[in-house]
Structures are given as C-alpha cells and as structure tokens.
C-alpha cells in the first residue's frame, strides 16, 4: 500500500501497512449478502422481489408483530391458520414442539427427504412444482413429507438454508431472526421445505427458545443430518483414553 498525501495510513510502519486490511461497510448487493455473510430478516423480506433467483423456492419468511406491554412484558402471535402466509400456502402443521438452545450453541445441518411421486424423476417433479406452477400450492405433498415452520421467542437465531433438491440450483440463504424478547422489525417466522438443509446458531447473549410446527408427525426415518459435528459434545482426550481401557504392555 503506497504512501500518498491523502493516505490516512501513511503514519504506520511498512510491515503494518503491508498487513493492513480494511472492511467494506457499503451495503453491497442484497443477493450476494443473502448467500454470503447474511442479512437481517427484514432486509430479506423487504427485498424479496429483487432477489429473484437468489431465493430458495418454497421458503417463506414472514414478519410477526410483537406488542410491548409496559410494566408487564410483551405479547406476540405466532400465526393464524385461517389467514396470512400459512393459509396462503395451505400449510397446517400436524405437530407442534418447542426447543431450547443455550448461548453459543448450534444445530444442523438437518434435512428431511422430499416425497417423489412414483414414475416421476425428482428433477422433473421439482421443475413442475417450483418452475412451471410455483403458485399452485395444492400440488405440494405436505402430508407425505416434512415441512417446518419456526418461530423464535428468545435469543437471536442465525439461520442458514441450502437447497439440495435434485435439478434445482444449489442456493444458500443466510439470515438473522431475533426472538420476541427483542421486539422489532426483524421478528419473523420461516417456512422450510423438505429437501432444504437447515442449520441454526444462537448468536445472542441468552438462551434461544423456539416453537416449531411440522406438516407431518415426527418420523425418525426422515431425520437426516449433513455436516452436523457441531452438535457433538466430545469428551476430553484424557477421558477417551481412560474409557478405551487399560493400556496394553
């Protein structure tokens, strides 16, 4: 990095100048940030129309409003099955559950197998669902595959989605959703189709509590994992050696 009259770093030693890096604080292209370092949920929702091919087909991200109640706390609806996004796409969860993730913990990647009708190639099936007739949600086999809809009550969730469905581009979406305890424009829910790998990381300073619904009841045969070593809690090396048994002489 050469020294010029307008160089703010001219006062540094040459070695430091050679190692110097600066950050780009410009907003940058939304699609690139969605697939890279990530965006806030409200940015993704507001920019959906301009994201085009960067958006994973079938994924829904919709805002939720959390009402602050002075001196008492807050109130937030999760969803209504008779209006809004879940009503529009015809998704009525058959099972509800909750989960807690401690600070700095992570889950994933999890993935559920998509149902492919007999006699149809997977790529042709997804082409029909998401390219030829993306608005015809009646063709989606919600009752034969697991879709998830997730809501966050506390903590801050960083979510990463990867489209692994045959014949569709491998898109990545990365965004952040705060829980209801941090009310604001980024409070949102997310719908994840089968065949889309998903990982969650609690990047807040409190436990993350989530509530999620699934389009079918739990089926252990549909619980896939990809690159999920982050979920393991390995024992200390000394413990592993001890548990392996006495050393042979």
Regions found by a protein language model. Name each.
Residues 2-186, 205-209, 214-249:
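Non-catalytic, conserved peripheral segments adjacent to functional cores
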Residues 159-160, 190, 198-203:
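Short beta-strand His + acidic residue motifs that chelate non-heme Fe in jelly-roll/DSBH
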């Amino acid at each position: 990095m050469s020294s010029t009259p307008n160089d703010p770093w001219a006062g540094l030693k040459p070695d430091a100048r050679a190692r110097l890096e600066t950050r780009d604080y410009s907003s940058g292209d939304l699609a690139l940030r969605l697939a890279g370092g990530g965006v806030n949920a409200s940015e993704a929702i507001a920019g959906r129309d301009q994201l085009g091919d960067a958006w994973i087909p079938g994924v829904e991200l919709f805002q939720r409003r959390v009402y602050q109640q002075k001196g008492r706390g807050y109130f937030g609806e999760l969803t209504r099955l008779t209006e809004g996004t879940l009503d529009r796409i015809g998704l009525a969860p058959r099972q509800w559950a909750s989960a807690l993730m401690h600070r700095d913990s992570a889950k994933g990647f999890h993935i559920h197998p998509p149902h492919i009708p007999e006699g149809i190639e997977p790529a042709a099936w997804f082409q029909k669902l998401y390219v030829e007739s993306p608005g015809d949600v009646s063709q989606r086999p919600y009752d034969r595959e697991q879709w998830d809809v997730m809501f966050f009550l506390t903590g801050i969730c960083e979510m990463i989605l990867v489209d692994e469905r045959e014949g569709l581009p491998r898109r990545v979406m990365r965004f952040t959703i705060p829980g209801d305890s941090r009310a604001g424009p980024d409070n949102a829910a997310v719908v994840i189709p089968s065949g889309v790998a998903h990982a969650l990381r609690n990047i807040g300073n409190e436990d993350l509590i989530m509530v999620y619904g699934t389009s079918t009841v739990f089926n252990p045969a549909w619980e896939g994992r990809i690159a999920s070593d982050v979920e393991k809690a390995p024992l200390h090396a000394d413990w592993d050696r001890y548990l392996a048994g006495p050393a042979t002489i």
